[in-house]
Structure formats: C-alpha cells, structure tokens
C-alpha cells in the first residue's frame, strides 16, 4: 500500500554570516514536524538549504576579499554542520548556486514569459539591501538620523535601472480568492490578516531582475540581467523535487504540505510565490506557516546589530534535546518568544529531569530490585490504572490535531500533561508500600507506569529523538515497534527482560555548583 506523501520545507537560510539561534529554531521545529509525520505513517520528504545569490553575498565577499562562490562554500558548510549538530533528519540540502537550480529557475522564468506575465521596463524605487526588497515611498520613513528606513527598520536607498517585471497586479483577485477559499493557506491568523490587507490595498508589478550585479542566475535570453533573488530563492522548493522533470519520482511530493518560514518573509511566500506558480501553471503549496522571532531576554537579535547567539554554543552548554525541547515547548509556535539561561534551565530540570527522568528512574529501579529486572505481569486494571493509560492514548490524538496546525507547543503540552499525571499516579499508588502489603498490586502499578512511559517515549521521539530512543531502549521497546501505531498496538509484555536502568535526563547543574 503506498503511503500518503508529505513534503515540508524550511526557508533557505542566507549564508552571508554564521548560523544563529533563529536559523536553529526554524530547523528544529520543522525537523520535529517531519519526524512526527514519519512516525504517523506518512512518506515524508524534508528539505532545507541555503539561498546563496544576491547583492548582500557580493558585498560580504568583497569586504573579505574573496569571491561570492568562496563565501557561499565556506558559510554553507557551517549551516550544513548546524543541521548535523541539531540532529536534523532532512532528506536533501539544496544550494541555490547548484546547476540543478539554475535550470529550474530558468524554466519557471520561461513558463511565466510564455504566460504573458514578464515584460521589460525601467525601475526606480527605494531598495533595502538587507531585506533584498523594494518598498513604496509610503512604506518608508526618514528618521532623526537623516536616514530613510523601510518597514523592517532597515536602511533603503534610491535605485534606478532597467528591469524585467512580473505582472503581479494581474493576480490580485486570484490571490484574494485563494485566501478566501483556503483559510489555512497562511497561518497563523495574524499573518493571514496582514497578507489579505496588503493584497487588498492593491498590488503593483514586481521588479524581478537586476543589472547592477552579476552574482545570480542569468535571465534566459538576456544575460546582462540576473534574476531578482526571490524568483531564484522561492524556486528551490521545486528544484529539489526534480523540476522541470515532472517524471522524476520526487515530483510526486509536490505540492508542499507546509513551507515553514519566518514571519518577516511571509509576503514573499504568501503573495509572490503563489502568483509565480499560478503563472507557471503549477499546483500551489497547501500551507505557508510563518513563525515568530526569538528574543534574547526580550531583545531582538540580528546579525547587523551583533547580539547573535551561536546555536553550537547552546547545544554544547545545555544539551541538544534540552535545547530542542525548550524551544518547542516554551514558545507558542507562530508567536514571538523570549529565551534566557534561567528559562532553559528551569524547563530542563522541571520537565525533563524531574518529571520524566525521575519517574523513569524510580519506577525502573523498583522493577530491577523487586521484579528480577523483568516487566512485571499485571493483574486486573483498577479505575486509576485505566485512567492514566487512557490519558496517554488521548494525548496522541491531541498531539496529531495540534501538529496538523503546526502547534508544537500544544502537542508537547498534551504529552507532558500525561507525564505529570503519571507522577501523581505513582505517588498516589505508593508501590513502595505495596511491596510489603500487596506485591501483586505493586507489580500492576509498576507495569502501568512503565507502559505509560513507553507510550510517552514513542510520542516524544519527534521532539527529543536521542533521549526518547534511550528511554525506549531501557523499556526494551522493540526498535521496529516505535511508530505511533504502536502506542496502542504493542504494549509491554510481562516477563520481558529489561536492561539495567540508566538515567535519561541529567539535571542541569550550574558550573559554580559543580566546583
């Protein structure tokens, strides 16, 4: 039976600097979504990569006295290393400087020409190098320092040049129909409202080529023009599936189920991209989900300001799964969030070390001591036993619904509510007292606790994969019985030998406490 296909992408990162926590946040979240759907039985294709053209790359390379290609090669290797360090399960890594991508971008350009949507004209307007975007005069302001800024707070300069244009104005009604008929196309709702209002206010044709630099994909038939970065960058999502070869087996993954992006690029993904695809007569993605920004103790981070946090250092300091868990649990996905050392330590120690780690350690140590290191044979289940087992099953359904809406924090919330309840169950049943008064009942309580831990272990795999694997290993859950379908289908068998219990989640101890 062929499994349902699921295609998910991150935005491609711009490698004119080093990776920062914002890049890591998007990759971790998207990786969890990809892993979740794989465990859910889907045939998943997960893409990430780097967007290597444009004037910022050229300027950064010149500053260092190297070519843009050398800069791209060097910095992209740091982004690839980040994907490895974060344990990302991406199926492909695309670079827009690759040959396959030149071909795809030129073919989609020609398809838009064939549809009558590209023409040559002259362009004059306010351009932000940092955003790689043009802004209307009304979207800019001159501040006290005498500099004119665009809506993202970046400086803009007046640019005049010959340019090719895309007839974006012709797509206004089609786009409004798209948003109207597919309310889930842009999420969360605040982003949808912003985009609808932007499109309703009237769309101007879009300048889609430049002649002032040459680090980019040449326009077919007019080589002195290179494609404006957004035609080139957005096309990466179909390049990776073999476009323009629609007989490529990967093409079956299109249209994408979800493009996961930062909210600062929602206009490009929710307005320009569907318009380009309509023009090229290609199917549209099902969803564009724009997440919020991460603030370091409430301060916005940016490469230009220089308060950028290195994700490699965070993993080194707190542990990978601890960082993954914190970012997905603490911040409602789609909203802005803040992080600090204290917040990461509190989440790690309270949820992972105390609630989940401690429960596993206590219950499995009791089994090792009192049940010959084997899963106990349970007796008849009491109401309390059934209630906690049922809550674990219900959490899977809640998590599935939450993940359909990219609500990672709600999925984790439901799973960790089971962990909290399992701790109350364990404390209330007092298996250490039952050891003397009712050893058979003690065995049932320990069985139920271990079985709840197995179900939780399966459900947390997308979020904290290495730790979940350790937990499932010490519960002797067979390696081929760890899909979501196994939560109910493959309960622990009484009499199974368990390995010696190992701590799964160490507490975070401050350096000065260790000395």
Curated annotation (Swiss-Prot):
Binding of ATP occurs at 303
Question: Which Pfam family, just one, is annotated for this protein?
Answer: Anticodon_3
Which reaction is catalysed here? tRNA(Met) + L-methionine + ATP = L-methionyl-tRNA(Met) + AMP + diphosphate
BP-aspect Gene Ontology terms: methionyl-tRNA aminoacylation
Extent of motif 'HIGH' region: 13-23
Q: What does this protein do?
A: Is required not only for elongation of protein synthesis but also for the initiation of all mRNA translation through initiator tRNA(fMet) aminoacylation.
Q: Please report the name of this protein according to its UniProt entry.
A: Methionine--tRNA ligase
Which species expresses this protein natively? Brucella melitensis biotype 1 (strain ATCC 23456 / CCUG 17765 / NCTC 10094 / 16M)
Q: Which gene encodes it?
A: metG
């Amino acid at each position: 039976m062929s499994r349902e296909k699921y295609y998910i992408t991150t935005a491609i990162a711009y490698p004119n600097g080093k990776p920062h926590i914002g890049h890591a946040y998007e990759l971790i979240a998207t990786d969890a979504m990809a892993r979740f759907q794989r465990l859910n039985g889907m045939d998943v294709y997960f893409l990430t990569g780097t967007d290597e053209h444009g004037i910022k790359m050229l300027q950064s390379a010149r500053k260092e006295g190297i070519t843009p290609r050398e800069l791209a090669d060097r910095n992209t290797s740091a982004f690839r290393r980040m994907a490895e360090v974060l344990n990302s399960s991406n199926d492909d890594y695309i670079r827009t400087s690759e040959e396959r991508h030149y071909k795809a971008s030129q073919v989609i350009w020609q398809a838009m020409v064939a549809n009558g949507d590209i023409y040559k004209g002259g362009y004059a307007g306010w351009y932000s190098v940092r955003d790689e975007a043009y802004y209307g005069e009304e979207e800019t302001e001159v501040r006290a320092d005498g500099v004119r800024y665009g809506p993202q707070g970046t400086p803009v300069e007046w640019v005049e040049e010959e340019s090719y244009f895309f007839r974006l104005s012709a797509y206004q009604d089609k786009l409004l129909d798209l948003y109207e008929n597919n309310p889930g196309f842009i999420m969360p709702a605040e982003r949808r409202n912003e985009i609808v209002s932007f499109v309703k206010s009237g769309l101007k044709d879009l300048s889609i080529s430049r002649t002032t630099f040459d680090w980019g994909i040449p326009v077919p038939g007019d080589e002195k023009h290179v494609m404006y970065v957004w035609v080139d960058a957005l096309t990466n999502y179909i390049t990776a599936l073999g476009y323009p070869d629609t007989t490529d087996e990967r093409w079956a993954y299109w249209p994408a189920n979800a493009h996961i992006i930062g909210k600062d690029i929602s206009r490009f993904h929710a307005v320009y991209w569907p318009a380009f695809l309509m023009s090229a007569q290609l199917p549209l993605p099902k969803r564009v989900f724009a997440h919020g920004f991460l603030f370091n103790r409430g301060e916005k981070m940016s490469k230009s300001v220089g308060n950028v946090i290195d994700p490699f250092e965070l993993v080194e300091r707190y542990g990978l799964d601890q960082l993954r868990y914190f970012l997905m649990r603490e911040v409602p996905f789609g909203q802005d969030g803040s992080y600090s050392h204290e917040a990461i330590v509190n989440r790690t120690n309270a949820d992972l070390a105390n609630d989940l780690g401690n429960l596993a350690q206590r219950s499995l140590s009791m089994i090792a001591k009192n049940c010959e290191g084997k899963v106990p044979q349970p007796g008849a289940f009491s109401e309390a036993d059934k209630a906690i087992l049922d809550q674990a099953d219900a959490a899977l359904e809640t998590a599935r619904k939450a993940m359909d809406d990219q609500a990672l924090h709600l999925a984790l919330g439901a799973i960790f509510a089971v962990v909290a309840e399992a701790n109350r169950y364990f404390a209330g049943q007092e298996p250490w007292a039952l050891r003397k008064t009712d050893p058979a009942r003690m065995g049932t309580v320990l069985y139920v606790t271990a079985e709840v831990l197995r179900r939780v272990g399966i459900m947390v795999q997308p979020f904290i994969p290495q730790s979940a694997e350790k937990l499932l290993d010490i519960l002797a859950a067979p390696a081929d019985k760890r899909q979501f379908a196994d939560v109910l289908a493959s309960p622990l068998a009484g009499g199974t030998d368990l390995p010696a219990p190992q701590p799964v989640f160490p507490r975070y101890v401050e350096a000065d406490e260790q000395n």
